[in-house]
């Protein structure tokens, strides 16, 4: 076992086949990569366990298949002098089984001529060894098929990366929805409309229960692929231990009571994880079990998770979050419903029309208004970002968002966010020094006609003109949000992620010129001492 071979496999153990008894192999410490990590690649685990077996298998069986060089005159035999793994392709077979294609390059000596004085020439040929591995039953069927390598023989299945996470691009999401429903709930196509999530769960062979999942209710749902003893919480908040069966979804009970649509969404989110990522979590659980078998007791929670591991977790959450609304609202179903709703509300102005359409879609598909709005925007019907926005615990009036505004920019800002930015962003403080802006309807708007008027409740509100021309009167913010997801080996859970969010003023070129002028004019008028400045803020900005 060479140092280069050990270094190429990022796994703490390596199994070397016993050529005297090929059915046996013994593990040894991988001195070049003996560091134990929280997450590993399936391809490294596969090579650590079976690479020597693959190469032995090739050497022993190549003579049965030949080397596809046509008829070789006076052929006597061949011998494999070296084998090299070129590539491993992975495909989903089922929720627990992964297809494995290993492409191996064989360096071969071909013997021809007379047996007493044979001629030898060298040849290089590539082969494909195809099989599958059952991660739930831990059964190896890796050596099912042996064939010369041809790219056109690649499988037409859902392809997986080295960690067993599906390879899905943004452009593949709608097609993936069709695959998901055909694979797990084909009955959906018989009656397009509202997805029966309970029926889907049963069809997928899963079970669902509601219970208390955490003290702080940060965990919305959990999927246990394999049975496990865990801590749950009763109605009064007391903890208790329970044995969870295989393939079980648990939903936070308070979520079911307070927000049934969100509970349905969470259950479907776990179904999406099961359909897409069960192989990943089954394998990582297998890896942890193997660590406990061959190493001293280890605290899995304290093992390091590298950047690639974090990226895989984020990727899986992105896939589940992007796929779930598409499963609940497939593109063709939305198109069909929109053909009915658009003529119904065509007499309204655009953003008020879409406010009504979103409400009807949410009711029809049994989803939240936010999800219905999100799907319409994705499908290109209209920029619905200014419709049904929930700020300061209330829906704010609809407004038009110009097409040039990026997805990361917004006119909306909560009072709490505004206070945070006010403390840290000098540009905002300079703008507010002008006294020309008012905080109204979740926006910072110019406090002047034709943008602000007094409503029937004697409070200020944005005018219809302001709602149609937001870039003229309202400050534009850019928001950045970084999500950090929890990772527990072998468990899929929908956890409210830890969020790091900041917002800062951006604005269109015209706004920036106007704000710069305001700032210059106002700085001349500002008080010079701290006490007067505080009084100035209270009097002019209402903060």
Feature map (PLM): residue ranges:
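Hydrophobic (often cysteine-bearing) scaffold residues that line and stabilize catalytic clefts
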Residues: 173, 193, 264, 268, ...
């Amino acid at each position: 076992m060479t140092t280069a071979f050990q270094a190429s496999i990022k796994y703490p153990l390596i199994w070397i086949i016993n050529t005297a008894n090929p059915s046996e192999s013994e593990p040894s410490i991988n001195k070049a990569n003996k560091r134990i990590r929280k997450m590993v690649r399936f391809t490294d685990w596969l090579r650590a366990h079976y690479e020597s077996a693959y190469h032995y298998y090739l050497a022993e069986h190549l003579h049965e298949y030949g080397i596809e060089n046509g008829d070789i005159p006076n052929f006597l035999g061949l011998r494999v002098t070296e084998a090299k793994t070129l590539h491993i392709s992975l495909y989903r077979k089922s929720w627990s089984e992964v297809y494995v294609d290993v492409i191996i390059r064989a360096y071969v000596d071909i013997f021809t001529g007379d047996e007493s004085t044979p001629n030898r020439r060298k040849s290089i040929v590539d082969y494909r060894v195809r099989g599958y591995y059952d991660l739930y039953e831990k059964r190896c069927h890796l050596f099912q098929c042996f064939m010369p390598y041809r790219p056109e023989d690649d499988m037409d299945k859902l392809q997986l990366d080295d960690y067993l996470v599906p390879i899905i691009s943004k452009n593949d999401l709608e097609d993936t929805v069709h695959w998901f429903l055909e694979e797990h709930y084909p009955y959906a196509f018989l009656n397009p409309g509202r997805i029966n999530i309970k029926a889907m769960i049963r069809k997928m062979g899963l079970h669902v229960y509601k219970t208390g999942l955490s003290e702080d209710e940060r965990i919305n749902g959990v999927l246990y692929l394999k049975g496990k003893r865990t801590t749950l919480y009763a109605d009064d908040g007391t903890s208790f231990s329970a044995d969870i069966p295989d393939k079980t979804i648990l939903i936070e009970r308070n979520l079911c009571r307070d927000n049934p649509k969100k509970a349905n969404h969470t259950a479907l989110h776990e179904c999406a994880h099961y359909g897409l990522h069960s192989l990943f979590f089954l394998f990582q659980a297998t890896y942890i079990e193997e660590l406990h078998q061959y190493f001293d007791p280890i605290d899995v929670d304290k093992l390091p998770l590298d950047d690639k591991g974090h990226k895989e977790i984020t990727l899986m959450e992105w896939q589940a979050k992007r796929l779930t609304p598409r499963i609940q609202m497939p593109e063709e179903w939305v198109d069909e419903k929109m053909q009915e709703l658009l003529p119904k509300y065509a007499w309204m102005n655009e953003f008020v029309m879409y406010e009504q359409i979103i409400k009807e879609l949410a009711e029809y598909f049994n989803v939240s208004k936010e999800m219905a709005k999100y799907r319409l925007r994705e499908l290109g019907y209209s920029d619905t970002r200014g419709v049904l926005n929930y700020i300061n615990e209330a829906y704010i009036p609809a407004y038009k968002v110009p097409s040039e505004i990026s997805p990361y920019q917004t006119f909306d800002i909560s009072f709490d966010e505004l206070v945070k930015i006010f403390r840290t962003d000098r540009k905002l403080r300079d703008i507010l020094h002008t006294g020309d802006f008012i905080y109204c309807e979740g926006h910072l708007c110019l406090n002047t006609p034709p943008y602000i008027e007094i409503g029937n409740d004697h409070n200020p509100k944005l005018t219809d003109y302001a709602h149609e021309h937001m870039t003229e009167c309202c400050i534009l913010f850019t928001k950045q949000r970084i999500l950090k997801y929890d990772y527990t080996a072998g468990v899929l859970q929908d956890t409210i992620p830890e969020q790091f969010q900041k917002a800062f003023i951006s604005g269109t070129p015209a706004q920036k010129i106007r704000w710069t002028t305001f700032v210059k004019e106002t700085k001349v008028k500002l008080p010079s001492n701290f006490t007067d400045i505080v009084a100035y803020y209270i009097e002019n900005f209402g903060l």
